């Protein structure tokens, strides 16, 4: 080892207080490959301020009756899509999804805009009081998602802790059902998923399956009973109840 190596490894730090910053050449020396990997550019996390999972828990503790919607993305091919922006209305277990060709923060913000246009501003603010999502870069446009096109606040966005998808576990569980139709690793377009209409069909079948925790009712039935105005808006968009005997949770559902 050279003297430089010993100084960089900290051998002389205790004896003489010499560090690598005391080396004249160190300022201009290129970082070794291993060290370069350690000093990664810090990610801008300003959007998390006031929106952490702890902030979320505090807010719902103070406002226990608010409607929470969990949000995520589902996809198989990260480079070519398609990308599904999923929403779960927690109170009834209803799953909704929007089809995208891109997984960008602009696309996800546009997805929230579309959901608002489907429900209308008043119902959106009633039923999407909170959006809880993960820290994926596609969801980093917090302020844009929180505001309607007219600039007024429409919802509050909060983020799960890193590597804690279980904090929105009810949505993850719903993804399991969706994956019966859209298996991981499959070419989703080859399966027949080529647009919003195809996605609506898949979502309709998932939401029409009876759920034991709902007393054998489906999420669509429960939504119709408890929040008919929400049900009607989604019905008009193409999310429709399928007879229980005709529910298909298999990949061949979308075959033309």
Describe every region a protein language model picked out:
Residues 1-192, 196-204, 208-211, 219-256:
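Secondary-structure boundary/capping micro-motif
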């Amino acid at each position: 080892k050279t003297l430089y190596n010993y100084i960089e490894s900290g051998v002389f730090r205790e004896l003489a207080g010499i560090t690598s910053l005391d080396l004249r050449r160190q300022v201009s020396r290129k970082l070794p490959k291993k060290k370069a990997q350690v000093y990664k550019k810090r990610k801008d996390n300003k959007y998390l301020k006031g929106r952490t999972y702890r902030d979320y828990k505090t807010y719902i503790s103070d406002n226990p009756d608010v409607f929470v919607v969990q949000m995520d993305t589902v996809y198989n091919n990260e480079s070519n899509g398609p990308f599904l922006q999923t929403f779960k209305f927690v109170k009834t277990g209803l799953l909704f999804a929007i089809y995208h060709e891109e997984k960008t923060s602009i696309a996800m913000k546009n997805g929230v805009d579309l959901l608002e246009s489907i429900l209308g501003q008043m119902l959106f603010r009633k039923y999407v009081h909170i959006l809880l999502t993960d820290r994926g870069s596609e969801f980093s446009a917090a302020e844009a998602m929180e505001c309607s096109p007219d600039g007024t606040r429409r919802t509050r966005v909060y983020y799960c802790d890193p590597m804690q998808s279980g904090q929105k576990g009810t949505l993850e569980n719903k993804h399991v059902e969706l994956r019966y139709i859209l298996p991981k690793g499959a070419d989703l377009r080859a399966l027949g998923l080529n647009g919003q209409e195809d996605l609506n069909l898949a979502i309709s079948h998932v939401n029409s399956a009876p759920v034991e925790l709902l007393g054998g009712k489906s999420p669509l039935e429960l939504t119709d009973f408890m929040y008919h105005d929400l049900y009607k808006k989604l019905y008009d968009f193409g999310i429709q109840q399928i007879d229980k005997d005709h529910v298909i949770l298999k990949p061949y559902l979308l075959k033309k």
